[in-house]
């Protein structure tokens, strides 16, 4: 062998050994990436009988992050609207909560629109990005809409970047799951088609993408064979190129795998944390990586944990707004239900009737007065014991307007019939006996002062309710609400105020005193 050839081989071999990239790749066998998620927090910053609170959630997430060097924390939507605390503070502590957990991306939930699309686009201040690939703005909407996806990255053991594309998807139910005025100028497109477009076209412009995650505010559960509840979402796990799906909306605890794709949902109100882990392996003679799902968990948030800074922020607002003021005492549990008329539904709707009486002349109250509320607007239960202002307000956290309309008996029957058969839950009511033939309302009796009488088809009555369903929310018939009681409606009374006022007027509440409708079925 010539000296020149020996020198060439020595130089070549030393370069090979000293090459950082090749040396690192030789040493690097596998790495792990973790996705930590939560969903449907709904602004439940304060710990109560329902939620562990923001302080416990933050600390629990940070503890999970500490065990995973490459952890990404994301939200599947419905972050700020849904608690009275959040309504009053306009979600003010959310930016701090996201900052402390390191959340930088979220799906758009239907309740993200409760304060208007302008708030979502410009006034929400979390240091993060809302993504929605299946929401498109009409030309006259006035602003470009939110991005369809966001790419996050970390550095693996070998020094190479690992890039994850999160594609946002939102339930098309948003069109009737928030007030119609809040989504004017927006179209909610088919989720599968929207995600497929991002995968097939737009992500290709972003260079090498190592992993794709669908970050969805779409309902899932463990009882449905396809896992996804909405018909237009059931094929999402079969979309080529998708590595994981993180979901929300249905408030269920879900950990499933369809077509080899892990699907997770972490309950609601911060009660659970979702965790998916993936083994990352280099593909020989390639810059690409093999992504393999190696396990997941839905971890119950530890209510005993506290993050000091988050706790101090929440306490500041509790004191400012007197959230701990005691209003009354419940001698029994007062529970809601979407399947039948409930104690909580009767209590809420009775408060509307009493508020109407309190604020209107006596001659305006001579007609039968019936309170109603859509099932989805009653968000919580009250349990035996003292009830403070925040606990009461969290029953009606959206704080809509309480309004009144003139109805005939025939219109009332239609409203109650529609409400009994509404797929979003039974319409709640008070001061009634409802005669049912199967699932159809045959007749309605008005019950007051220990007496009852049939409300005839042509007889006038007044329905007092929250304004959400009056413009078609939850798929109710807006044509029923054509004769407003303007002298009441123009005062812009708030549902939550009416309910709190009602509770304060009662030193003690017994379940037996709540005017829950009675049902009489035809044999």
Regions found by a protein language model. Give the residues of each.
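Low-complexity, intrinsically disordered or weakly predicted helical/coil tracts enriched
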Residues: 10, 225-226, 440, 447
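Bacterial Sec-dependent N-terminal signal peptides
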Residues: 1-27
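Acidic, metal/ion-coordinating pockets
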Residues: 25-298, 343-355, 362-371, 402-406, ...
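Residue-level detector of intrinsically disordered, flexible termini
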Residues: 9, 20-23, 70, 243, ...
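Catalytic centers of hydrolytic enzymes
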Residues: 28-34, 44-46, 58-66, 100, ...
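Residue-level detector of intrinsically disordered/flexible regions characterized by low predicted structural confidence
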Residues: 6-8, 259, 281, 520
């Amino acid at each position: 062998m010539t000296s020149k050839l020996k020198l060439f081989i020595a130089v070549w071999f030393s370069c090979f050994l000293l090459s950082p990239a090749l040396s690192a790749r030789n040493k690097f066998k596998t790495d792990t990436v973790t996705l930590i998620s939560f969903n449907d927090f709904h602004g439940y910053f304060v710990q109560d009988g329902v939620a562990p609170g923001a302080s416990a959630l933050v600390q629990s997430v940070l503890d999970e992050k500490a065990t995973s060097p490459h952890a990404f924390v994301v939200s599947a939507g419905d972050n700020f609207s849904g608690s009275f605390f959040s309504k009053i503070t306009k979600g003010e502590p959310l930016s701090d909560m996201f900052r402390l957990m390191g959340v930088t991306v979220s799906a758009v939930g239907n309740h993200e629109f409760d304060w208007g699309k302008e708030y979502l686009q410009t006034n929400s201040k979390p240091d993060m990005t809302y993504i929605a690939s299946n929401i498109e703005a009409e030309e006259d909407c006035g602003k470009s809409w939110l991005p369809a996806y966001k790419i996050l990255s970390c550095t693996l053991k070998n020094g190479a970047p690992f890039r994850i594309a999160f594609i946002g998807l939102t339930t098309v139910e948003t069109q009737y799951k928030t007030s119609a005025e809040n989504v004017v100028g927006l179209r909610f497109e088919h989720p599968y088609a929207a995600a497929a477009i991002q995968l097939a076209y737009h992500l290709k412009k972003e260079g090498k993408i190592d992993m794709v995650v669908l970050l969805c505010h779409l309902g899932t559960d463990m009882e449905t064979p396809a896992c996804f509840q909405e018909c237009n979402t059931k094929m999402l796990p079969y979309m080529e190129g998708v590595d994981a799906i993180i979901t929300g909306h249905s408030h269920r605890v879900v950990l499933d795998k369809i077509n080899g794709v892990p699907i997770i949902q972490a309950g609601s109100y911060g009660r659970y944390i979702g965790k998916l882990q993936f083994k990352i392996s280099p593909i020989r003679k390639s810059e690409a990586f093999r992504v393999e799902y190696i396990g997941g968990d839905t971890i119950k948030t530890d209510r005993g944990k506290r993050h000091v800074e988050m706790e101090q922020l929440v306490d500041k607002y509790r004191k400012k707004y007197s959230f701990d003021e005691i209003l009354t005492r419940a001698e029994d549990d007062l529970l809601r239900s979407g399947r039948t008329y409930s104690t909580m539904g009767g209590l809420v709707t009775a408060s509307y009737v009493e508020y109407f009486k309190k604020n209107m002349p006596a001659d305006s109250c001579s007609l039968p007065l019936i309170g109603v509320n859509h099932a989805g607007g009653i968000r919580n239960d009250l349990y035996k014991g003292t009830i403070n202002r925040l606990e009461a307000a969290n029953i009606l956290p959206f704080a809509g307007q309480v309004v009144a309309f003139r109805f005939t008996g025939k219109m009332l029957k239609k409203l109650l019939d529609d409400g009994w058969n509404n797929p979003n839950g039974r319409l709640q009511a008070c001061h009634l006996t409802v005669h049912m033939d199967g699932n159809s309302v045959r007749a309605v009796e008005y019950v007051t002062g220990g007496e009852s009488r049939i409300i005839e088809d042509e007889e006038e009555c007044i329905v007092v309710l929250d304004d959400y369903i009056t413009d078609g929310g939850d798929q109710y018939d807006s044509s029923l609400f054509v004769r407003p009681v303007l002298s009441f409606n123009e005062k812009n009374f708030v549902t939550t105020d009416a309910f709190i006022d009602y509770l304060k007027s009662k030193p003690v509440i017994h379940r037996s005193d709540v005017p829950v409708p009675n049902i009489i079925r035809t044999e």
